[in-house]
Amino acid sequence: MKIPNIGNVMNKFEILGVVGEGAYGVVLKCRHKETHEIVAIKKFKDSEENEEVKETTLRELKMLRTLKQENIVELKEAFRRRGKLYLVFEYVEKNMLELLEEMPNGVPPEKVKSYIYQLIKAIHWCHKNDIVHRDIKPENLLISHNDVLKLCDFGFARNLSEGNNANYTEYVATRWYRSPELLLGAPYGKSVDMWSVGCILGELSDGQPLFPGESEIDQLFTIQKVLGPLPSEQMKLFYSNPRFHGLRFPAVNHPQSLERRYLGILNSVLLDLMKNLLKLDPADRYLTEQCLNHPTFQTQRLLDRSPSRSTKRKPYHVESSTLSNRNQSTKGAALQTHHRSNSKDIQNLSVGLPRAEEGLPANESFLNGNLAGATLSPMHTKTYQASTQPGSSSKDLTNNNIPHLLSPKEAKSKTEFDFNIDTKPSEGPGTKYLKSSTRSQQNRHSFMESSQSKAGTLQPSEKQSRHSYIDTIPQSSRSPSYRTKAKSHGALSDSKSVSNLSEARAQITETNTSRYFPSSCLDLNSPTSPTPTRHTDTRTLLSPSGRNNRNEGTLDSRRTTTRHSKTMEELKLPEHMDSSHSHSLSAPHESFSYGLGYTSPFSSQQRPHRHSMYVTRDKVRAKGLDGSLSIGQGMAARANSLQLLSPQPGEQLPPEMTVARPSVKESSREGASSFHTRQKSEGGVYHDPHSDDGTAPKENRHLYNDPVPRRVGSFYRVPSPRPDNSFHENNVSTRVSSLPSDSSSGTNHSKRQPGFDPWKSPENISHADQLKEKEKQGFFRSMKKKKKKTQTVPNTDGPDLLTLQKAIHSSSTASSRPKEWRPEKLSDLQTQSQPLKSLRKLLHLSSSTNHPASSDPRFQPLTAQQAKNSFSEIRIHPLSQATGGSSNIRQEPTPKGRPALQLPGSSLLRYNGWKHSRSRSSQPDEVIFLASHEKWKQ
């Protein structure tokens, strides 16, 4: 039925709100005004003007008209209005994304199995019709109030029967759920959907995304940190892909593994399914039929066989006029099963198998469409697995390309929307699979058959499947698998395939792991049962200083650890725990974990918000609050927005680490290099430590790894530690350093800077005590003149007042400034344009403090004479002068040295290092002092 272009159809609905917004339109929640039924209407953008939108719209409509199954969202109506297409769907209350918001620590195991089973059934029906969804993610999985899962959004789905010339888009599927072959730009098939199922299975289990990569290259490395290095064939594709030109993966000799990642969260049976869904080699990955027969779904299969569900059977499933006589033997069994259940699908699947002359068991051995457990097991041999695959992956619709979709009506004009929503009797799933089942013999070379043995070659065939996993491999190719020379990559040169791969293998097979890994984790991959004693030094091994294993000329470990490597890997309990360990299930992540040391060199640490990688979404996902872990839930609370921007190792921190940086006690051990590195890393979140001593990565890791927001933000409020506990000493320093006292010189310096007493220069020590009084008089005399000069020339601008207040508040004088302070840190106390104003202010304040003493009439005549003598003596005998000149030189001329063209840092170092230069030669400083004294005399 052709949908007329009428403008009043939308008037039947009352718009209640906006459900969501996607790349090609908006989804509205509406109520039918007559029936009061709640529906979801997907309103596409201007499809008449935009060819891409039109193509996507047509594709989705074709898919939805074909896919009638209980776990696929139902298309109720389609109409056009003002050039825009409207699709009316059943309304489902929420999606899995919102479910994960409500349950930040994951879903109970039974619900996980139920959701995954329903998802696999929906994908199985798609794959039976040669449709690959390619964008399976929590946002596209709707969940009703009675926990029925619905797969939606077929805008990126692809019909595999479109042939060799089909333009298979590489950028499909949200990045976190994209398979390695998609990321590498390799030919792909149905297994890309199965990879997404494995990722969702992990995310449902603990509430955290399994592979949260922030770019294609980072996604590939994030996968390898858990699953290990890519196979050599995929490495070839990586090095030959121009997008990754010049890049190289760091060695991952000790991947975290799914066992460690989900220890205490997934049972062994469900973990086995997950491992088979997340095989790096797509040829080894489970397809839908193998998943549905997995022992973990035994309860769900029994529920599907329940007779009470057979009453929901739709008549169009058995009214097909195209059923052949060969179908009669299974037609009776088909009536016993639910029309939308997977059992019916597999029965239909088994109908066409005798035509393909496959050596399968008789149809009677199928229970509800599934082989009996003794006959078909997920642990059965690979040859038998491969022999059962044509049913689930044969391309039996190649001949007519789903005739009712590509009907002659659509050949008239591609701009016409010809959408017959009413299903014909011949369009039932039972018959759809049989229309071209005679072609199944010619289409046996589907993607799963290509792996009958890992190194087996494909059998040549005239009618090789055009839509199989190897559809882009040249016909002349007789290579082991899909990953040889794909058209999209060109030939591999010797330099690419030999030298680069040898370098990669050298990294992967590197045996000198003790250089990068603590001895406690060297034998974690050994087949023997490890000893439990390796956890004794867990707390000291948290620093990545011993685990930066990527300083080998690759993209080095320049970034703090990724969110995944912390929250996903560091918090997961290693597999090597046995019964002798004392870790409880409620907190299984306190142990040293395997993927801990793999900092992603491809990560910028600004993790994208969940599920926002493909479509820009206005709604930022609210993360769950931090809460205690329940038994069996081994992860921290669902990441909040702060965690998405930085890696969070969480429980791995020792309990005493309540601030986001190492304690002062740690800083005294780490020396000067770690202190300077820490000061740089505190400036911003994304500083990249390049030091080789391993301490800087430790600082960064402690800086950004707290899972609680208040602790993440606390490092803005806690003063940075100083070397050798001077963090505390600077705060208690007094301002009496202008007086002849030892209090300031003894407490305000670190080990590397000996204390300096301005009153005890070498000349002072050699002179008699009667000169001390003259020193004081000369000092106070110069102070008084200085005060008069500053009163006549007001220069107390805003920054000076601010720096003066800061200086008074911190009670730090010029002599108490550590020599290690960098010039950039001085900007906290003074402006860069006038670096020594604060010193002048400090000295000026000291003179005002001692003003009663300086105004004493006994000192004034002596001070005037003493000042003249000292100034003249400095000119003639600079090194022998030991009276008032020493105090004047030490305390006073430095502010007047500002007119000399010096950098702020050099001026301060000259100020602090006066004691060193004076003992050797005073010539550099004398120039400044002479100019200053000449000015004073005027």
Curated annotation (Swiss-Prot):
Q: Which GO terms describe its cellular component?
A: centrosome; ciliary basal body; ciliary tip; cytoplasm; nucleus
Stretches assigned to the Protein kinase domain: 13-297
Q: Which domain of life is it from?
A: Eukaryota
Q: Does the keyword Chaperone apply?
A: no
Q: Does the keyword Amino-acid biosynthesis apply?
A: no
Q: Residue spans with biased composition (Polar residues)?
A: 319-331, 382-402, 434-462, 473-482, 494-548, 728-748, 880-891
Binding-site list for ATP: V19, G20, E21, G22, A23, Y24, G25, V26, V27, K42
Coarsely, its chief localization is nucleus
| Active site residues of this protein | D135
Q: Which GO terms describe its biological process?
A: protein localization to nucleus; regulation of cilium assembly
Q: Which ranges of the sequence are coiled-coil? A: none
- Compositional bias, Basic and acidic residues, is annotated for 407-417, 549-559, 679-704, 769-778, 817-827
Which keywords are on file for this protein? ATP-binding, Cell projection, Cytoplasm, Cytoskeleton, Kinase, Nucleotide-binding, Nucleus, Phosphoprotein, Serine/threonine-protein kinase, Transferase
The UniProt annotation puts the region (Disordered) at 298-348, 382-566, 646-865, 877-938
How is the polypeptide modified once translated? Autophosphorylated.
Q: Which GO terms describe its molecular function?
A: ATP binding; cyclin-dependent protein serine/threonine kinase activity; kinase activity; protein kinase activity; protein serine kinase activity
Residues with the Phosphoserine modification: S407, S479, S720, S761
InterPro entries referenced in this protein's UniProt entry, alphabetically:
CDK, Kinase-like_dom_sf, Prot_kinase_dom, Protein_kinase_ATP_BS, Ser/Thr_kinase_AS
- Its Enzyme Commission number(s) read 2.7.11.22
Cellular location(s): Nucleus; Cytoplasm, Cytoskeleton, Cilium basal body; Cytoplasm, Cytoskeleton, Microtubule organizing center, Centrosome
Q: Which Pfam families match?
A: Pkinase
- Annotated catalysed reactions: L-seryl-[protein] + ATP = O-phospho-L-seryl-[protein] + ADP + H(+); L-threonyl-[protein] + ATP = O-phospho-L-threonyl-[protein] + ADP + H(+)
Give the protein's biological function: Mediates phosphorylation of MECP2. May regulate ciliogenesis.
Assembly behavior:
Interacts with MECP2.
Q: Which family does it belong to?
A: Belongs to the protein kinase superfamily. CMGC Ser/Thr protein kinase family. CDC2/CDKX subfamily.
Q: What name is this protein filed under?
A: Cyclin-dependent kinase-like 5
Organism field: Mus musculus
